[in-house]
């Protein structure tokens, strides 16, 4: 179209008469050509700007796409690592479960063995209980027999004493007992707690010694020769009392200074509820479970 306009312009120039000025139509066409050129340049610039913007956005999109791909690759790697870790944990759990099953089976077998052992123990306890009861019966019979033998021995001892005195009937103490002022005394060579010593004397048809006077105290003190020995005095069941029922409050006393004190600082539990003769002679209260020597006493009796 531009070309046709130029051609038309040239034809008009040739047809114009010489010596005349260009017409107003020609000038208008020149101006139209300029506008068209400027429009084309503007349009080109606009297209260039659009292309630049699109190119810039495309570059940004490519960068964003690269970032997304990198993020996706990183996330994929992490997910793969997590899956591998989960697989490893699953294997460990399976091994742990297998081990637990083995342990449970072992414990089940041990429990069964324990039940069997418990039944055996119960059976053994029953057997031991029966044997213990039989032994107690035998021990009771044996104790009665020993006591009878002691009586027989005492009778023989007294009969021997009677023969030595030309048949005169005399009072006598059992063998290895010491006679003093109408009583027989037996001084132990071993040590026992107060309850065990009390039991021993009762089995001998006697009791732990009861000190009734200063004279008896001096006799015992001289015979003991500085040996600590239990006597038949206790307050385990209330106030102090003698084992043979002798009135303690009205009777002879020989406590050491500041005694009895019922001391709790010995660390053995409880107080001090049993009395003994000290090495110097005075009495002292002490823990009944301590072990000392002891003295048994019985009244002198005649045997026919």
UniProtKB/Swiss-Prot annotation:
A single GO molecular-function term is:
carbohydrate binding
The record, for SMART domains, names: CLECT
Disulfide linkages recorded for this protein, renumbered to the chain, are 173-184, 201-296, 274-288
Q: Which residues are glycosylated?
A: 74, 166
Q: Where is the C-type lectin domain?
A: 172-298
Instruction: Report if keyword Disulfide bond is assigned.
Output: yes
Q: In which tissues is it expressed?
A: Detected in lymph node in the subcapsular sinus, interfollicular regions, T and B-cell boundary and in the areas surrounding high endothelial venules (at protein level). Expressed on the surface of activated macrophages. Expressed in heart, lung, testis, skeletal muscle, spleen, brain, kidney and thymus. Expressed in P388, RAW 264.7 and M1 cell lines.
Q: Which residues cross the membrane?
A: 36-56
Q: Is Membrane among this UniProt entry's keywords?
A: yes
GO cellular component, alphabetical, reads: membrane
Q: Where in the cell is it found?
A: Membrane
Per the UniProt topology annotation, the Cytoplasmic ranges are: 1-35
Which PROSITE patterns does the annotation name? C_TYPE_LECTIN_1 (PS00615), C_TYPE_LECTIN_2 (PS50041)
Question: Which InterPro entries did the record assign?
Answer: C-type_lectin-like (IPR001304), C-type_lectin-like/link_sf (IPR016186), C-type_lectin/snaclec_domain (IPR050111), C-type_lectin_CS (IPR018378), CD209-like_CTLD (IPR033989), CTDL_fold (IPR016187)
* Sequence ranges on the Extracellular membrane side: 57-304
Query: Which biological process annotations from GO are given for this protein?
Result: connective tissue replacement involved in inflammatory response wound healing
- Pfam families per UniProt: Lectin_C, Lectin_N
Membrane-protein topology = Single-pass type II membrane protein
Alphabetically sorted, this entry's keywords are:
Calcium, Disulfide bond, Glycoprotein, Lectin, Membrane, Signal-anchor, Transmembrane, Transmembrane helix
Subunit structure as annotated in this protein's UniProt entry: Homooligomer. Interacts with SIGLEC1, which may act as a counter-receptor for CLEC10A in lymph node.
Q: What does this protein do?
A: Recognizes terminal galactose and N-acetylgalactosamine units. May participate in the interaction between tumoricidal macrophages and tumor cells. Plays a role in the recruitment of inflammatory monocytes to adipose tissue in diet-induced obesity.
This chain's protein is named C-type lectin domain family 10 member A
